[in-house]
């Protein structure tokens, strides 16, 4: 009997019953994919969807993003009814589009419009990775190009928040040509003295990273964002070298001169406000007709 006192007993983990799981409504708790901490969802939302334990930036949808940076009630949306078709008759593409529309309550992977930041008018575009992984098809490219042209007409800055897996394969070359179309629109805006701020969020990859996302007068990013063209494995197989652990992160790009700043979500609105304030009455006043 005494000998049993010094024997290490096996530890058992209690597994919640199915009834216990059902007692916690869906969406009440959120698990951080980085530190694995489980938190109340309302606590994460209150903190702009940033983990209160490790600072991981959870993805934001387009409306959450707009609410976090624009003055309350100032946003006016552009081209809301524009939707993608299936010009290449790609199998199941229309069904997938319809599924994403129902799931996200969006017509496409980008929301564009105008609003104010501390009463300064801007045209803004926000990509939403919930819709076809934020991929760029004809409508995404067209909406962004139109938004840039609107910024040109209004003589105001253009700001974009990117989150994308790249060009949309279901639209083939029609998708790839959006890289050129958006870049040309931005060049016109730039030549006229227009300010363009690009904010890259997780993930910004493929044709989006290789076109408009990297063309900002200011290129910013959120902490830990994955930014790059090809995938890590493809690059390693091509160069036959092991890449650094932090390769293609926002911090790696900042260290190597490809970003101007990595900005915490808490500081994003204020950082944008300061940039806009610097350019008020400066180069923005020297518009060419």
Curated annotation (Swiss-Prot):
One of its GO terms (molecular function) is carboxyl- or carbamoyltransferase activity. Pfam families: Carboxyl_trans, Zn_ribbon_ACC. InterPro entries: AcCoA_carboxyl_beta (IPR034733), Acetyl_CoA_COase_Trfase_b_su (IPR000438), ClpP/crotonase-like_dom_sf (IPR029045), COA_CT_N (IPR011762), Znf-ACC (IPR041010). Disulfide bonds: none annotated. Its main location: cytoplasm. Gene3D superfamilies: 2-enoyl-CoA Hydratase, Chain A, domain 1. Its EC number is 2.1.3.15. Keywords: ATP-binding, Cytoplasm, Fatty acid biosynthesis, Fatty acid metabolism, Lipid biosynthesis, Lipid metabolism, Metal-binding, Nucleotide-binding, Transferase, Zinc, Zinc-finger. It catalyses: N(6)-carboxybiotinyl-L-lysyl-[protein] + acetyl-CoA = N(6)-biotinyl-L-lysyl-[protein] + malonyl-CoA. Residues 28-289 form the CoA carboxyltransferase N-terminal domain. A zinc finger (C4-type) spans 32-54. GO terms for cellular component: acetyl-CoA carboxylase complex. The keyword rRNA-binding does not apply. It is found in: Cytoplasm. Its cofactor is Zn(2+). The keyword Nucleotide-binding applies. GO terms for biological process: fatty acid biosynthetic process; malonyl-CoA biosynthetic process. HAMAP family: AcetylCoA_CT_beta. Acetyl-CoA carboxylase is a heterohexamer composed of biotin carboxyl carrier protein (AccB), biotin carboxylase (AccC) and two subunits each of ACCase subunit alpha (AccA) and ACCase subunit beta (AccD). NCBIfam families: accD. Component of the acetyl coenzyme A carboxylase (ACC) complex. Biotin carboxylase (BC) catalyzes the carboxylation of biotin on its carrier protein (BCCP) and then the CO(2) group is transferred by the transcarboxylase to acetyl-CoA to form malonyl-CoA. This is Acetyl-coenzyme A carboxylase carboxyl transferase subunit beta. The gene is accD.
